[in-house]
């Protein structure tokens, strides 16, 4: 799988597949939805400003009740990334500046993996207790694909 980022441009609104995934994860991890679609730029100092993946309708922020549950959610997303078509996961509370997992990293010869963030290169919310994740475009538009993927994860 390749990382899409914002190549698909801004969406016109919420996308049904991402909303289905967010609702399922909220249920599984007793978590709060902190937001999905919003038309905005990334929260960084990039010049010129860069579109947020939230604006594509493929990114979500979610916060379980405890740090341990957030860690379980992050592990679940990364462990099942191929099946769930997860392209990126942000762990803001890891280390000083957080870390990001991506389905394909240049520095890892295109393989999936974690990158520890620095003061200059980070996800913009160091120390935050929530998780950010991004899904592939084909899943963002298909609650049916999302439901089938969760069934596969749980062996049903």
Show the residue positions of the predicted features.
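Low-complexity, Gly/Ser/Thr/Pro-rich intrinsically disordered linker/tail segments
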Residues: 8, 135-156
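Mixed-charge, low-complexity intrinsically disordered segments
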Residues: 101-115
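Intrinsically disordered, low-complexity coil segments
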Residues: 95-96, 108-112, 124
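Short proline/glycine-enriched turn/loop segments at secondary-structure junctions
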Residues: 116-124
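Secreted/periplasmic proteins that engage bacterial cell-wall peptidoglycan
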Residues: 1-104, 119, 128-135
């Amino acid at each position: 799988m390749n990382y899409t980022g914002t190549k698909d441009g801004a969406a016109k609104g919420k996308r049904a597949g991402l909303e289905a995934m967010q609702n399922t994860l909220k249920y599984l991890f007793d978590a709060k939805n902190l937001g999905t679609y919003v038309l905005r730029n990334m929260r960084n100092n990039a010049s010129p400003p860069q579109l947020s993946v939230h604006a594509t309708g493929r990114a979500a922020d979610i916060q379980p009740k405890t740090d341990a549950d957030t860690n379980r959610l992050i592990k679940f997303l990364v462990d099942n990334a191929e099946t769930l078509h997860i392209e990126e996961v942000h762990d803001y509370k890891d280390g000083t500046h957080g870390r990001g997992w991506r389905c394909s990293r240049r520095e890892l010869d295109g393989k999936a993996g974690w990158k520890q963030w620095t003061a200059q290169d980070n996800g913009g919310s160091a120390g935050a207790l929530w998780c950010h994740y991004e899904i592939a475009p084909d899943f963002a538009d298909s609650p049916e694909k999302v439901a089938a993927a969760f069934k596969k994860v749980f062996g049903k």
